[in-house]
């Protein structure tokens, strides 16, 4: 199994590199995901109205198995920082893991630097609001309610505490775009958010937010590998049906 796993990784890496090269000649077209359309609208309204976005990366530390959603959120954060640098209120980031908080501060600084607005950067906008699930949520709720937030982007590792964040967003009439990998969090998000990101759509955040060609190429590579797996399964079923070992 380890050899098969290594082969899959190498094939995926090769596909991604090849697609990055091909993307220079043609821009890929992805299906529309309503949550990302809503996010783009929220970004524009934030700049026009002089309000701020709230991005929450969850509480998946980098040394835990649940680190991937937070990294996906960081990839999107860089682009959001650049796009909202003209707003009167800089976006604010919350997280429930110390390493994620540090990375969010670094990502904010890099985003403002890329937008030639480094003077806007304030390390206090990358906040560690709590180290346990509900202390993390309790620290983020006052921010949603009291800091002129017009939209919330919740992309990371969440548990049942995500319901507190989406409830606070609803009470302040600030829309939320949310995604998580925990089944309980997914159920709560689906019930409480108008446009949830379902399943693997969470990991498409970087590609859909314009974070770079590598993110778009990786999304295309996932689609190709998915079709390869489907064809292998169908081929195996056909061989089994006709009694071919």
Name every feature range the model reports, one short phrase each:
Residues 1-33, 239-243:
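Hydrophobic alpha-helical transmembrane segments of small proteolipidic membrane proteins, enriched
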Residues 31-52:
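Membrane-cytosol interface motif
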Residues 58-74, 97-101, 156-162:
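Gly/Ser/Thr-rich loops at beta-strand to alpha-helix junctions
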Residues 67-88:
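Histidine-anchored nucleotide/phosphate-binding helix
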Residues 83-85, 89-137:
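Long, charge-dense
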Residues 115-171:
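Membrane-proximal low-complexity regions enriched in glycine and acidic/polar residues
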Residues 150-200:
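Extracytoplasmic/lumenal ectodomains and periplasmic regions of secretory and membrane proteins
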Residues 184, 192-245:
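C-terminal functional extensions of proteins
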